[in-house]
Regions:
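Active-site and donor-binding regions of nucleotide-sugar-utilizing enzymes
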Residues: 10, 33-35, 41-52, 74, ...
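N-terminal subdomain of nucleotide-sugar transferases
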Residues: 2-63
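Short internal beta-strands
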Residues: 57-65, 203, 290-297
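A donor-sugar binding/catalytic signature common to diverse glycosyltransferases
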Residues: 125, 133, 149-150, 157-159, ...
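Donor-nucleotide binding loops and adjacent catalytic segments primarily
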Residues: 74, 242-340
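A nucleotide-sugar donor-handling region in carbohydrate enzymes
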Residues: 2-20, 63-69, 195-273
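C-terminal amphipathic helix plus adjacent low-complexity
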Residues: 2-8, 13, 28, 401-452
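Catalytic binding pocket for nucleotide-activated donors in carbohydrate/polymer assembly enzymes
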Residues: 351, 357-404
Length: 452
C-alpha cells in the first residue's frame, strides 16, 4: 500500500536555515510558533514581534486552517507577515485537515533534520483551535517532546440551564451558581484541553485559568499567569485603526449608536438558534435600536444549510443593516473606539476580551463562556443565549435601554484585566526556558514484519 504524500505549500529556505543555525549556535530550543485561525493571526502578532526583537530562534509556521484573506490579513496588517517561514496549506473538512496536518508535520520534521538541527524544536501552540490540539499531539507522538501552550486553561462556565427561563434581569446571572460545561464550545472546549495535555509550559491569561489547570492536576511549576495577547493586539492596532476606511465604506455607521452583531460558533449555527437571534434582532430594530449584523462564512453557510437565507431579507425589511465581514481587524477596533458602538452581541471569545480591554459593553450569544472572568470579575460582559426570539428581544431591549453602569458596572475595571506587554513577557520567559528531555524510547524504531 503506498505511503500517503503531502507537500508543504511554501517554505522560506533561507529563514529556515538561519533559524536552525541560530538554535545550534546558541544551544537553545528552536521555537515553532504555530498560526492556525483568525484569532491566532491577531493575538500572536505581539509575541512574534517580541521574539524577533529579543532574537529568539524561531520559525513562524502557518497551518492554513484559515486561509480566506479576510481571515488571515492581520499578518500583514499588524506588521509581521515578512517573518513567515513555513506554510502547510491544509484544506478540507475537520478530519481531512487533521490528517494533512500530521503529514505536514512529518515533512517539516524531515526538513529540520535535513537542515542539521541539533537542538530541541518546541512548538508554541495557541488557544483552542484544532491545530493547537493536534499539532501538540502529533509532535509529542513523533518526538516524545512537549509543547508550550499559550492561552491555556480556558474552560467554559455558565449558569444551570434551567435558570434562564426564570431570569427577569439579565445581570442577575452573576448571582447564580455557575457550573462547568466540558464540551462547550464544540470542538474548541476539547481542543484546548488536548493542547495542554502534552504541554510542558502552560501560559494562562488570568488567575481563573490557573485555578482550572491546578484542579485538573497540572503541577504549579508548569503554570504561568501571563495575561492575554488580546490586550497587546488591541494596543498594537489602535494607531493603525485611526486610518481605517470603515466609515467611508459604510457611512451609515457614522450616524448614531449601533449594536454590532456577529455569530460563527457551531452551536449557534442551528436553525433554532439562527431564528431566535435574527428574529429577535428584527424586533429590536422595529423598536428603534440601530443594529448592524456582520455576516461570517459560518453564518452564510448555516443559512443555506437550513434553507433560511430568506431570514436576512426579513430582518433587513425590519431595519437591521446587514454587511459582509469587515475587511480588517483595525476596522473592528476603529468602530469599537469610535463612539458609534452601543454594544456588542457576539459569540467570539476574542471579542469578549477586546471589548473588556476597550471598556465596550458586551453580550455573549452563548449558554456558557470560556471567558467567565469577563462576566463575573470584570463585569464587562453578560451571557444572552439564543433561547427564543422573544427571549433575545426582551433582554436586549431591557439591557440596552438601562444605564450602562447597571448592567456592566466594571467597564473601567476590566481594561486592566488582561495585562499589558504580554508578548514581551512571554518572549522573556522563552529566553530562559529549558525544554525537558524527550521521553526515553520515543525514538525507538521497529522493523516491519517481512512475510516468510
Amino acid at each position: 500500500m503506498p505511503e500517503p504524500s503531502f507537500n508543504l505549500a511554501w517554505v522560506d529556505e533561507a529563514r529556515l536555515a538561519d533559524a536552525i543555525d541560530q538554535a545550534n549556535r546558541e544551544q537553545r530550543p528552536l521555537y515553532l510558533i504555530v498560526l492556525a485561525t483568525k484569532p491566532c493571526y491577531i493575538k500572536l502578532a505581539s509575541l512574534v514581534l517580541a521574539c524577533e526583537a529579543v532574537r529568539l530562534p524561531f520559525l513562524l509556521v502557518d497551518s492554513g486552517q484559515h486561509y480566506d484573506p479576510v481571515l488571515t490579513q492581520a499578518r500583514e496588517e499588524l506588521g509581521y507577515e515578512h517573518l513567515l517561514a513555513v506554510s502547510f496549506g491544509i484544506r478540507g473538512t475537520l478530519l481531512g485537515r487533521t490528517a494533512q496536518l500530521a503529514l505536514a508535520i512529518e515533512k517539516l520534521d524531515a526538513q529540520l533534520k535535513a537542515g542539521g538541527l541539533r537542538q530541541s524544536a518546541v512548538p508554541l501552540v495557541s488557544g483552542d483551535t484544532a491545530t493547537a490540539a493536534m499539532f501538540a499531539q502529533f509532535w509529542y507522538l513523533a518526538h516524545g517532546a512537549r509543547s508550550v501552550h499559550i492561552e491555556a486553561g480556558l474552560r467554559s462556565y455558565g449558569p444551570d440551564r434551567g435558570a434562564w427561563t426564570n431570569l427577569q434581569d439579565l445581570a442577575e446571572q452573576r448571582q447564580l451558581r455557575w457550573q462547568r460545561f466540558c464540551e462547550e464550545p464544540f470542538p474548541e472546549g476539547v481542543c484546548t484541553t488536548l493542547a495542554s495535555v502534552v504541554g510542558d509550559l502552560l501560559l494562562a491569561p488570568v488567575e481563573r485559568n490557573v485555578e482550572h489547570l491546578l484542579r485538573e492536576g497540572y503541577p504549579l511549576p508548569q503554570l504561568r499567569q501571563v495575561g492575554s495577547l488580546s490586550s497587546d493586539a488591541v494596543r498594537l492596532a489602535l494607531p493603525r485603526a485611526a486610518r481605517s476606511p470603515l466609515f467611508s465604506l459604510y457611512p451609515e455607521l457614522a450616524q448614531g449608536h449601533w449594536l454590532r452583531v456577529d455569530l460563527h460558533r457551531r452551536e449557534n449555527m442551528t436553525a433554532q438558534a439562527l431564528q431566535a437571534v435574527l428574529q429577535g434582532l428584527g424586533r429590536l430594530a422595529i423598536d428603534g435600536v440601530q443594529v448592524v449584523l456582520v455576516r461570517t462564512n459560518a453564518l452564510d453557510g448555516a443559512l443555506v444549510q437550513h434553507q433560511l437565507a430568506g431570514l436576512l431579507d426579513e430582518v433587513r425589511l425590519k431595519g437591521v443593516v446587514v454587511q459582509p465581514m469587515w475587511p480588517h481587524y483595525t476596522d473592528v477596533i476603529h468602530f469599537l473606539t469610535s463612539g458609534h458602538c452601543l454594544a456588542l452581541y457576539t459569540d467570539s471569545g476574542g471579542l469578549q476580551e477586546e471589548a473588556t480591554v476597550l471598556g465596550v459593553p458586551c453580550l455573549t450569544c452563548r449558554l456558557s463562556t470560556d471567558r467567565p472572568e469577563t462576566v463575573l470579575d470584570a463585569q464587562s460582559n453578560l451571557l444572552l443565549p439564543p433561547l427564543s426570539a422573544a427571549f433575545v428581544h426582551r433582554h436586549l431591549r431591557d439591557v440596552l435601554t438601562r444605564p450602562v453602569a447597571e448592567a456592566w458596572p466594571g467597564l473601567q475595571r476590566g481594561r486592566t484585566l488582561y495585562g499589558q506587554a504580554v508578548g514581551q513577557g512571554i518572549a522573556e520567559l522563552l529566553k530562559v526556558y529549558e525544554a525537558p528531555a524527550v521521553l526515553a524510547g520515543a525514538q525507538a524504531q521497529y522493523l516491519p514484519r517481512v512475510p516468510e
